[in-house]
Amino acid sequence: MIAFIVLLSLAAVLQQSSGTVDFASESSNKGENQKQIVKKHNALRRSVKPPARNMLQMEWNSRAAQNAKRWAERCSFTHSPPSLRTVGKLRCGENLLQSSQPLPWSKVVQAWYDENKNFVYGIGAKPPGSVVGHYTQVVWYKSRLLGCASVKCSPTKYLYVCQYCPAGNIIGSQATPYKSGPRCADCPSACVKGLCTNPCKREDDYSNCKSLAEKNKCMEEWMKSKCPASCFCHNKII
């Protein structure tokens, strides 16, 4: 989801209150900026309310960053097609922001997160129809790989793109982007400052794999092939 009018208005307010920033200095090609982008995301994921029991810690992914850069350079100001948002077998989500002036990455990520003012856990957007998809992607529990890029499309148009793998905003689950509960309750032995560090790196092909696994279907070969996460990722965040 994207709503440039809302995000542009917010970006303009943030820019006016924070002064100018050198666009080149915020390049996501720089290692220190990559670390800051990841740090900002993890800080926000750690601070969700209600707290999350299964929120994975994010890390930078160069392939996702390359995909984000290639798309940003097109200056199309629309979401990239899913076929251009993959890292290995993972399908990735995407957040965009357009600004009339350059912004520090911390402000960009915060702008996405601030949609939480119109989000109620377990209910979703409130009032109904409010734009909250950028927020829910930032805090989607399973999105653990992150790559971002920005481009100056014109003197008054700057585009910021982040891709998240695996993708969030799964249809039917947007109101619960994570499981609420005590921080790290689902990963007590793999927790760093409230974030889980034990992701399952396998992906199920079907949405009902978990229920099938609970019925001891993992003894069957087709199940092992189509539901590897549910069958093999014990004590991991799936």
From Swiss-Prot:
Residues 39-164 form the SCP domain. It comes from the Eukaryota. Keywords: Disulfide bond, Ion channel impairing toxin, Neurotoxin, Secreted, Signal, Toxin. One of its GO terms (cellular component) is extracellular region. Gene3D superfamilies: CAP (3.40.33.10), Crisp domain (1.10.10.740). Its main location: secreted. It is found in: Secreted. PROSITE patterns: CRISP_1, CRISP_2, SHKT. Disulfide bonds join 75-153, 92-165, 148-162, 184-191, 187-196, 200-233, 209-227, 218-231. Residues 20-27 form a propeptide. Residues 1-19 form the signal peptide. It holds the Pfam family Crisp. Expressed by the venom gland. Belongs to the CRISP family. Blocks olfactory (CNGA2) and retinal (CNGA1) cyclic nucleotide-gated (CNG) ion channel currents. Does not inhibit retinal (CNGA3) currents. It forms high-affinity contacts with the pore turret region and most likely inhibits CNG channel current by blocking the external entrance to the transmembrane pore. Does not affect neither depolarization- nor caffeine-induced contraction arterial smooth muscle. This is Cysteine-rich venom protein. It comes from Demansia vestigiata.
